[in-house]
């Protein structure tokens, strides 16, 4: 049955570049190198975001063609992922998993997450993955996508 599902499927690559603190290399530099080598039609970038209010924490998913600047929501901006920097259209997908809870008058940021953030991130990642698969493979049914995504 898998061969039948994959018949006629467009080629798609996946990459998890890691973060600078782990790899020693900017994520955008890794992605840029892969883009130059593989020449994709577009790049889909997924990242965590910072929420402006608690009611949005792990409850919304943002999709944009404007790109994304990792770390910008927590004051640690890294190199941008955008059409300008990568040379191909970029679809950026993100969900807010942290927020700044500093009190008025405090200078230092206080980043907080929900107590059950791990479970929420697992659910968000399943939803985002299903959405990306539905967009990339519009002929697939919900059941076919669910075979590959924990829905």
Predicted ranges, named:
Residues 1-14:
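Glycine-rich phosphate/diphosphate-binding loop of Rossmann-like nucleotide-binding domains
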Residues 91-151:
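C-terminal functional extensions of proteins
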Residues 60-115:
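Glycine-rich phosphate/nucleotide-binding loop
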Residues 14, 24, 32, 80-82, ...:
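Non-transmembrane, aqueous-exposed alpha-helical and coiled segments at domain scale
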Residues 15-16, 45-47, 92-96:
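Short beta-strand segments
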Residues 21:
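Metallocofactor- and cofactor-centric catalytic cores in central/energy metabolism, strongly enriched
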